[in-house]
């Protein structure tokens, strides 16, 4: 048997290793250019990403935020003692006046009542067409003095949807009481539920003791009311066209009366008090004075008690942009003066907001970006926006063409050609920058969506060849 040529075998081994090395490098280079399907992050990885992003970026964790650029505070002729206006698409605060003052919300409380109802409907536990029983404590005749009323009466047949209309349009305290009794079995349980929802939203200055808004011990602030209104409209946009935008409401109607009450006279005199049996249809206009008066107004809710003054949660949508404003402690010695103040303040805020800002939407940019990855166990890193505003609030005054300021918005997408080595979840690798006339409006970081570990030495060496020898 011939003696093996050790030197020759060594050279063959080196050549084989070198060939394998070059093949590996070639495969890596090819797949970098033409990547296979990228593995989606699992639920655990997505949950970690959400946690890290919420900790790192303030604009994710808060309902309301200051504008991401500096502006000169507006000096508006607003008679209400406290007020705020926000861009509903992103929560940017456009205007504020003593917005952290605690004030009774009065009947704006009923927005929280409707919020709970919508939640219960979503679970399937209750439905809009449910017929709601009316115990004596829900009748109009048993409401406190000077209550706003839907005019619920003994033996009435009323649906949950009608009670919601009565709460939203004519601000019926009796309707709110009936809803509380039906949804949670009583006022105390319903108030506990309302306050739980308040806490879940992080509203620390808001608290309720009853559901109609009659009590001066109910408390909120314009800022927290605006935050709630934003969440309410985001989660239940149907509330606007189904309830808050309705101009009037007539109750009771023929179908609401029991058989025995249908034979009673339809004309009644309430000047000496409200009877148990109500058979006369009562027509009431929506308490929001800007509905049908101010272009684009489709909600939201008024409130008044002596301790709160004339409150108004107002929302208007024009040209795709929705503004929410809250005015509280509005002045007026009578209802007519209070309504005039609501119209004046609401119009002043909305006129200014729509003439000063526009919403810019570009959803195509707020997507995933696949970046080549070398020296790592995977060959692509997916970058996602750290947060995704529905729209960018653009200041009209910064544009040269104030008629079409959105045409001047410039977008700068900054991405790396490739990423080297291990990647941590939520690690920044680029950004989307929006500018107007050289002013940065907002810069949204692009971050990795999951962890990718460093590759072994063999793969890292192959990637080195891919990068330098194969010109990748």
Predicted regions: what is each one?
Residues 1-16:
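N-terminal Sec-pathway targeting helices
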Residues 2, 33-226, 230-235:
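Active-site-adjacent loops and short helices of periplasmic peptidoglycan-processing enzymes
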Residues 7, 87, 259:
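Catalytic-site microenvironment of enzymes
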Residues 11, 36-38, 349, 369:
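Membrane-proximal periplasmic segments of bacterial cell-envelope enzymes
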Residues 22-35:
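Membrane-interface motif at the C-terminal end of an N-terminal transmembrane signal
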Residues 203-204, 216-472:
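Domain-terminus/edge residues, biased toward the C-terminal soluble/receptor-binding domains
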């Amino acid at each position: 048997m011939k003696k093996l040529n050790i030197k020759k075998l060594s050279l063959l081994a080196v050549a084989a290793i070198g060939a394998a090395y070059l093949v590996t490098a070639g495969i890596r280079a090819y797949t970098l250019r033409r990547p296979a399907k990228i593995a989606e992050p699992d639920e655990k990885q997505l949950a970690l990403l959400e946690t890290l992003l919420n900790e790192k970026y303030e604009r994710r964790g808060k309902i309301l935020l200051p504008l991401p650029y500096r502006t000169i505070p507006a000096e508006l002729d607003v008679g209400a003692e406290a007020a705020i206006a926000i861009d509903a698409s992103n929560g940017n605060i456009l205007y504020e006046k003593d917005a952290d003052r605690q004030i009774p919300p009065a009947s704006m409380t009923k927005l929280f009542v409707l919020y709970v109802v919508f939640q219960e409907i979503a679970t399937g536990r209750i439905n809009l067409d449910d017929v709601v029983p009316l115990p004596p404590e829900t009748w109009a005749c048993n409401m406190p003095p000077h209550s706003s009323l839907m005019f619920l009466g003994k033996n009435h047949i009323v649906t949950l949807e009608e009670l919601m209309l009565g709460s939203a349009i004519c601000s019926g305290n009796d309707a709110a009481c009936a809803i509380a009794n039906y949804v949670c079995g009583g006022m105390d349980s319903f108030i506990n539920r309302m306050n739980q929802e308040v806490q879940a939203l992080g509203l620390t200055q808001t608290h309720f003791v009853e559901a109609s808004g009659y009590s001066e011990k109910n408390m909120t602030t314009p800022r927290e009311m605006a935050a709630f209104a934003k969440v309410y409209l985001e989660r239940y946009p149907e509330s606007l066209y189904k309830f808050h935008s309705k101009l009037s409401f007539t109750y009771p109607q023929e179908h609401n009366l029991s058989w025995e009450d249908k034979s009673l006279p339809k004309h009644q005199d309430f000047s000496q008090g409200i009877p148990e049996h109500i058979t006369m249809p009562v027509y009431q206009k929506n308490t929001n004075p800007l509905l049908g008066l101010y272009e684009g107004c489709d909600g939201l809710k008024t409130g008044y008690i002596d301790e709160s003054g004339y409150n108004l949660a107002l929302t208007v949508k024009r040209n795709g942009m929705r503004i929410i404003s809250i005015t509280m402690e509005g002045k007026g010695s009578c209802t007519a003066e209070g309504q005039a103040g609501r119209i004046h303040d609401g119009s002043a805020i909305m006129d200014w907001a729509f003439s000063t800002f526009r919403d810019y939407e570009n959803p195509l940019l707020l997507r995933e970006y696949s970046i080549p990855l070398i020296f790592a166990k995977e060959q692509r890193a997916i970058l996602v926006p750290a947060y995704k505003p529905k729209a960018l609030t653009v200041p009209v005054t910064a544009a040269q063409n104030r008629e079409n300021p959105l045409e001047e918005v410039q977008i700068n997408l900054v991405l790396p050609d490739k990423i080297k080595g291990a990647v941590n979840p939520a690690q920044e690798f680029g950004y989307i920058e929006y500018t107007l006339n050289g002013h940065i409006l907002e810069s949204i970081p692009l971050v990795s969506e999951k962890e990718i570990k460093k590759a072994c030495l063999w793969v890292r060496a192959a990637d080195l060849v891919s990068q330098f020898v194969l010109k990748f």
